[in-house]
């Protein structure tokens, strides 16, 4: 009877080891859950960035104002009969 209890205890310990430390065990589960959470956060951030880019594309396709604004800011273009003024901030060191 004592031998039977020892064998059952050994089998139980073997199963417990496999449950906690084996392939697809608890530690693998926790690691995978952390990776999933990290990927979900990254996907959320990328989804927000995609929405911003999609809105900008839609605005560039549909709106003339966005194209004019981009041309003015990036290339300093002006309309005919329009005067361009650049206001430079004065450095405190030059006083």
Curated annotation (Swiss-Prot):
Coiled coil stretches, renumbered: 28-62
Ranges in the topological domain labelled Periplasmic:
22-95
Listed transmembrane segments: 4-21
Q: Give the range the annotation lists for the signal sequence.
A: none
Q: Which InterPro entries does the annotation name?
A: Cell_div_FtsB, FtsL/DivIC
Instruction: Identify the residue ranges that face the Cytoplasmic compartment according to the record.
Output: 1-3
Concerning Pfam families, the annotation shows: DivIC (PF04977)
* Swiss-Prot/TrEMBL GO biological process terms: FtsZ-dependent cytokinesis
Name a GO CC annotation attached to this entry. plasma membrane
Q: List the disulfide bonds.
A: none
Its annotated compartments are: Cell inner membrane
Q: How does it sit in the membrane?
A: Single-pass type II membrane protein
Key words of the record: Cell cycle, Cell division, Cell inner membrane, Cell membrane, Coiled coil, Membrane, Transmembrane, Transmembrane helix
Q: What is the recorded function of this protein according to its Swiss-Prot or TrEMBL entry?
A: Essential cell division protein. May link together the upstream cell division proteins, which are predominantly cytoplasmic, with the downstream cell division proteins, which are predominantly periplasmic.
Similarity section: Belongs to the FtsB family.
Provide the assembly information: Part of a complex composed of FtsB, FtsL and FtsQ.
Provide the protein name: Cell division protein FtsB
The species is: Mannheimia succiniciproducens (strain KCTC 0769BP / MBEL55E)
- Specify the taxonomic lineage: Bacteria, Pseudomonadati, Pseudomonadota, Gammaproteobacteria, Pasteurellales
Q: Which gene encodes it?
A: ftsB
């Amino acid at each position: 009877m004592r031998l039977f209890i020892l064998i059952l205890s050994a089998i139980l310990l073997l199963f417990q080891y496999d449950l906690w430390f084996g392939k697809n065990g608890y530690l693998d589960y926790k690691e995978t859950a952390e990776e999933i959470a990290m990927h979900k956060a990254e996907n959320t951030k990328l989804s927000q960035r995609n929405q911003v880019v999609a809105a900008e594309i839609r605005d560039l396709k549909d709106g003339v104002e966005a194209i004019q604004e981009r041309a003015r800011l990036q290339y300093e273009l002006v309309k005919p009969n329009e005067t361009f003024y650049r206001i430079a901030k004065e450095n405190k060191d030059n006083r």
